[in-house]
Structures are given as C-alpha cells and as structure tokens.
Design a protein with these regions (language model features):
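A cross-family phosphate/adenosyl-ligand binding-site feature
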Residues: 1-137, 142-201
Length: 201
C-alpha cells in the first residue's frame, strides 16, 4: 500500500471517459474535493456527456462550476506546448497527482488503457502513470459490453499492473436495458479512492 500523504491534502486526478455516466462527474468531483485537491481530465467524447450534467443534476452542476475545480481536455495539452522545453501537461499531471481515478471508464477507454494506447490527454496520462502510486477505475458501459469476454480480459490486464477496479452496479441503464454496467455510486468510488491512499474516506 502507498504511504499516506502527510503535510498536505491528497491530490486526486479524476479522469472521465465517454460514457453517459459522465453526467455524474460533478457530484463525484465535489465529493472527492471534500477530502482532497481534485483536477478533472475529460476525453473529447466525455465532454459531450459533461455538457448534459446540468440537466441531470442542476444543484451539483452549479456547485461544481463555482468550486474552481479545474477541468482539462485534449486542447489544454496542445495549447500548453508550443516549443521544446515547454511543460507537457500529461507529464505534469502524473507528477502532481497522488492517485488517478478514471470514473466512468468506458469500454473504449478500458481497451485503450489495457493495450497501452495513448492518443488523448487521459490515455497519455495513464500511459505515463507512476505505478508506485495508486490507480483506480470504475467501469460504466452497456450490459452487453460489460459481459463481453474482452472486458474481463482487459480488467485482468489492468489488475496485473496494480489497478483497482470498482465494479459497476446492476440497474436500468440509460439505454433502457436492465443489468450490470451502471457506474458505481459516488460513495463507493470515494471509499475505493480513500482505500487506495490508505485513507478511511
């Protein structure tokens, strides 16, 4: 287990991939921000769903917007780098964070992380991750995707690296199907994040 962070608040990097469950990211980020410093990285597909978060939970969205929690995406990586010697955002995020949490983790991003692909800010940060520090994922996808054999294979590959997975919940999904694949609830993800850091959150 990693040494507990001493002398300052833990730093949690929250990644969100292209799942409709991204509408829950403001609430999750706020819950984590009660106990840690938080920054958020969204994929381009996740931005589509984050834009729907206000309609999903207006109160959480308003608090999130007022919180000052930084939200980064691919454009920030490219805007920050103009010439050799400039900061590389995914490398800086790796240095900054004590913990990487990807919630929701889509089927596509799961496949990318398990196979080492790195074509956006989130996957580049994961590919550069220091595995002496904890890494937690919370998958969220349609039941058919969740039960696909490759999903178990990809999660097993991540576990070999030391990545902890918060299993999805079974419920009626956004697509109308009933079954496993829903993002775990916010308290479960926060608890897993704390456990990864040796904290009882």
């Amino acid at each position: 287990a990693p040494a507990r962070v001493v002398g300052r608040r833990p730093r949690v990097l929250l990644g969100a991939a292209g799942s409709v469950a991204t509408v829950k990211v403001p609430k999750l980020a706020l819950a984590l921000a009660e106990v840690a410093d938080v920054r958020v990285v969204v994929t381009e597909k996740a931005k589509t769903f984050l834009a729907k978060a206000e309609a999903y939970d207006a109160a959480a969205w308003a608090t999130f917007q007022a919180s000052g929690i930084e939200v980064l995406s691919d454009a920030d990586e490219w805007d920050a780098w103009q010439e050799i010697g400039d900061d590389v955002v995914h490398v800086e995020l790796r240095k900054w964070a004590d913990l990487l949490v990807v919630a929701p983790l889509s089927a596509n991003s799961l496949a990318k992380l398990a196979n080492g692909l790195c074509d956006d800010l989130l996957s580049c940060t994961a590919r550069a991750w220091d595995f002496d520090k904890p890494f937690v994922v919370a998958p969220a996808m349609n039941t058919a995707m969740w039960t696909h054999p490759l999903t178990a294979t990809h999660l097993a590959d991540l576990r070999v690296l030391g990545v902890a997975a918060v299993p999805p919940a079974s419920k009626k999904l956004a697509c109308g199907d009933v079954g496993p694949g829903a993002l775990a609830d916010v308290p479960a993800i926060v608890t897993a994040a704390g456990a990864a850091l040796g904290e009882a959150w």
